[in-house]
């Protein structure tokens, strides 16, 4: 009977934790009102998710932005609610809404492509019978927070190379360390985790390329790979080298990206949560304190 009673009135620890989209012209009063409304309807935790449509007056990770984050966290604490921090401005995660690359273009996403024309700046990986296999910047982007920064728009932020330890370190310094600096007294109590969302190695809006990073050629060679055989990737064929490539790529992503975030979260008293780039990337779930992708539905509030 106790079990049935808990099903009818579950403890707060079993609450749903929805994405709470932070956009528009946010105010302290409105944040407090919406959190109180969540609690009144049995929602005792939220993911603070900055989202497209954020006021241009609110700079991502800026002073006003963090003042609003503090308001939300303090209000949640007063309501005995839990907060999960979202580690990006929109998605995919890993670029701090373009800030990782802004002053460090060398940290932008890169990949390999098969081409008949080697361009200045290309790194020749192998010459094959179907063309040159070269490494170049992918030009991949992410969805931004402000109007004019969405997919296909000229100000869409560039994505960072999440296989590059230096890029991931910069992402953590810009994002995780900034949140900790601003609201560290709530880590491990009100704040229980960081949510990373579908990190993409190439970024969005990229075609004709496969992920790569500086130093990966040597990793591949030492594992017994022949780079010339990766030309098969571009016509959908498989061979021992394409299978080795995918295996090493996932290992690298796990160690450099997910592993770094997981260790940071553990060291700061919270857990890594999130959605891998591919929902069936089971191997990387070992880095998550709360494994498993998200469930997508919508909670709509009526304006008053």
Describe the function of each predicted region.
Residues 1-13:
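N-terminal carbohydrate-binding accessory modules
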Residues 20, 76, 194, 265:
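Conserved, mostly hydrophobic/aromatic
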Residues 33-49:
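Catalytic domains of carbohydrate-active enzymes, especially glycoside hydrolases
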Residues 49-169, 173, 184:
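Acidic/aromatic-lined carbohydrate-recognition and catalytic surfaces
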Residues 61, 93-117, 200-231, 285-293:
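Aromatic- and acidic-residue-enriched segments that line the glycan-binding/catalytic groove
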Residues 84-89, 195-197, 257-280:
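Aromatic-lined carbohydrate-recognition surfaces of secreted/lumenal glycan-active proteins
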Residues 237-268:
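Active-site neighborhood of glycoside hydrolase catalytic domains
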Residues 297-304:
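Conserved small/polar residues in nucleotide/adenosyl-binding loops
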């Amino acid at each position: 009977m106790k079990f049935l009673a808990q099903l009818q009135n579950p403890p707060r620890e079993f609450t749903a934790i929805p994405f709470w989209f932070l956009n528009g012209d946010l105010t302290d009063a409105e944040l407090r009102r919406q959190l109180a409304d969540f609690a009144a309807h049995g929602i005792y935790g939220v993911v603070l998710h900055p989202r497209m449509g954020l006021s241009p007056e609110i700079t991502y990770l800026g002073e006003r932005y963090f003042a609003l984050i503090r308001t939300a966290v303090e209000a949640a604490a007063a309501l005995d609610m839990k907060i999960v921090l979202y580690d990006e401005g929109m998605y995919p995660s890993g670029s701090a809404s373009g800030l990782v690359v802004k002053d460090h273009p060398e940290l932008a996403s890169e990949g390999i492509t098969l081409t008949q024309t080697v361009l200045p700046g290309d790194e020749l990986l192998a010459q094959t019978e179907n063309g040159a296999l070269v490494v170049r910047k992918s030009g991949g982007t992410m969805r931004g927070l402000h109007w004019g920064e969405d997919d296909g728009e000229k100000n869409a932020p560039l994505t960072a190379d999440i296989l590059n330890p230096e890029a991931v370190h910069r992402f953590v310094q810009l994002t995780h360390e900034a949140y900790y600096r601003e609201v560290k007294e709530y880590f491990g109590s009100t704040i229980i985790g960081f949510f990373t969302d579908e990190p993409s190695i190439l970024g969005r809006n990229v075609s004709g390329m496969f992920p790569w990073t500086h130093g990966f050629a040597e990793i591949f060679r030492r594992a017994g790979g022949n780079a010339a055989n990766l030309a098969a990737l571009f016509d959908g064929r498989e061979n021992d080298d394409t299978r080795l490539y995918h295996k090493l790529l996932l290992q690298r992503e796990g160690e450099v990206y997910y592993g770094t975030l997981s260790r940071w979260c553990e060291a700061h008293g919270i857990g890594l949560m999130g959605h891998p780039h591919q929902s069936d990337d089971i191997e990387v779930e070992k880095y998550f304190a709360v494994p498993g992708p998200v469930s997508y539905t919508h909670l709509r509030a009526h304006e008053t």
